[in-house]
């Protein structure tokens, strides 16, 4: 018989590549400025998948999961405007602003603030190995699901909780499962901004996982034409249902040739041709897609790299120089998001202007965390897998 200890909770603890174990761990205690959230749903992110497959981004003993939604069950004495029973999305673990004086704050990057209350210590073995997100000494204020326990558990705490700062209420019309898309949707919003889209642009999105499908929907109101590509017919069909204008099955035809056919042959300084897409947002993390993205884009166009690559890529960098491409990337969209942007993203979900429910392909209970991750690895069968503690 399974005996549950007092003040404990069930959690999926990460022990390394392809090794989660559902265990009873100590339930966190909140401080006067914190709130406790009972996790109702947590989405599997692409970075979680890399941790599962390769053992990176986390370390043994942590509880992963950062795309979560739940119900407030405990509120610290100094917290205002958040009540027990509120349905919420907790966002991230970095404070709203840095010290304002350090190297990073002076460069408008407070997410890397050197103040000890905001940034890793720089001294522990993890920091010395440049794995600052795993800092052993400053877990309280680090990102949930990376360096402090996250959403693959029954409960999680939110430090220094503030409404529309790191806690956002869920409208009645939005389910917990749909609300887990708030963080990735904001990421999609920022990645589209990086591309500086114009109303007359043609944009290409390569890779139609959750992020690619969200990027596609955010782009819809900002450009004149969207072309998408993937190797999964399931995901391509979903893109069609979400009103993608042009869909390319990269397993059956050459995406570069098709984009060139649709956009025209644009020559660069080197004299070589290629596509004339104004924007390419590469979300797949496939080496072939990276190379195609460079060739699909017109001279002077924008390439945004979103997908994570498992291996080094051999590539002629002169192609980027000759085409005068604006190449940008981001592992994390940046500093604490302005509250207005997050509220806007929640409104996009609530209004169904960005459709997230069709992206949920599977749901699993916490006890089945391993089958959940195995399912998420199968791109031909899944889109977004939700874990429900």
Question: Language-model features: where?
Answer:
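Glycine-rich beta-strand-centered segment in the early N-terminal region that forms part
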Residues: 28-42, 55-128, 169-173
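Short N-terminal strand-loop motif that marks the start
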Residues: 1-74, 84, 154-158, 162-168, ...
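NAD(P)H dinucleotide-binding glycine-rich loop of Rossmann-like/cofactor-binding domains
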Residues: 96-206
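Mid-domain Rossmann-like dinucleotide-binding core that forms the NAD(H)/NADP(H) cofactor-binding site
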Residues: 154, 169-253, 257
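Glycine-centered, small-residue-biased loops immediately flanking beta-strands
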Residues: 301-302, 325
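C-terminal hydrophobic helical "lid"/dimerization subdomain
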Residues: 2-7, 268, 291-295, 339-389
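C-terminal substrate-binding/catalytic core of Rossmann-like NAD(P)-dependent dehydrogenases/reductases
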Residues: 257-268, 274, 311-362, 370-371
